[in-house]
């Protein structure tokens, strides 16, 4: 299967990536999980793709759902056997604490960058912290 993934939210932050992959499993739907004040999350339709030894979860709906271990369990992936798990999140890695030997934070370009000054602000009242120097009161 050749498919375009990602890059659909805002073309300013990246374009879709063409992948040639094998469909490993189809699933998704609603998950009952107590997470960050939510009692459940809905992935919508989801597919697990394989590109060589790499597994990629692609979901219909955006959100935090793909950042919970129950999603891997849903697709019969044992996290204890994984050499590496990459999450598209800056904070939800805590759910993986029992499997973590190392956390490597990566600040990728796009709408979730930690470098707020690099975002294309257009209608932002100035000055505003942390983008501008603020006068001491």
Give each language-model segment a name.
Residues 30-137:
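Extended hydrophobic packing segments that form well-structured cores
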Residues 1-50:
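C-terminal catalytic subdomain
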């Amino acid at each position: 299967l050749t498919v375009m993934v990602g890059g659909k939210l805002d073309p300013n932050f990246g374009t879709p990536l063409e992948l040639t992959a094998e469909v490993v499993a189809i699933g998704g739907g609603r998950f009952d999980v107590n997470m960050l004040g939510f009692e459940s999350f809905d992935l919508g339709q989801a597919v697990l793709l394989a590109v060589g030894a790499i597994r990629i979860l692609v979901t219909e709906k955006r959100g935090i759902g793909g950042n919970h271990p129950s999603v891997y369990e849903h697709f019969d992936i044992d996290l204890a056997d994984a050499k590496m798990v990459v999450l598209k999140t800056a904070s939800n890695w805590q759910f993986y604490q029992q499997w973590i030997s190392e956390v490597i934070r990566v600040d990728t370009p796009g709408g979730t960058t930690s470098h707020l000054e690099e975002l294309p602000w257009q209608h932002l009242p100035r000055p505003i912290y942390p983008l501008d120097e603020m006068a001491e009161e």
